[in-house]
């Protein structure tokens, strides 16, 4: 079974969200997603400062098997991207919840972030999507 940390929030598109500040989150793909993708060879991410809209594509992950779109779990501004993935995209496979993170997003304010996180899946609900 895939590793699903209980302290994170999830999307049906197999991304995770970790609150990292009052109005910021860190985003990555789940263990299930990296396992399904196979060996990741390239990650395309937006520039710092880019505006994301929840539910819309913001980049892609390319593996030896396929290319998959990444979808924004929340709306906001990209404040950081994981530049380590440029030279080491395999970090998405080896440490999807740590060194393989994708980007940080700042939401307009703490209330907006609270609302956005509430709309995401908790670990148990995400686990349920994997067994359907």
UniProtKB/Swiss-Prot annotation:
PROSITE patterns: BIOTINYL_LIPOYL, LIPOYL
Keywords, in A-Z order: Lipoyl
Lipoyl-binding domain residues: 24-106
GO cellular component, one term: glycine cleavage complex
Modified residues (N6-lipoyllysine): 65
Cofactor comment text: Binds 1 lipoyl cofactor covalently.
Obligatory cofactor(s): (R)-lipoate
One of the GO BP terms on file: glycine decarboxylation via glycine cleavage system
Keyword Zinc-finger included in the entry's annotation: no
Self-association and partners: The glycine cleavage system is composed of four proteins: P, T, L and H.
Similarity annotation: Belongs to the GcvH family.
Function: The glycine cleavage system catalyzes the degradation of glycine. The H protein shuttles the methylamine group of glycine from the P protein to the T protein.
Name of the featured protein: Glycine cleavage system H protein
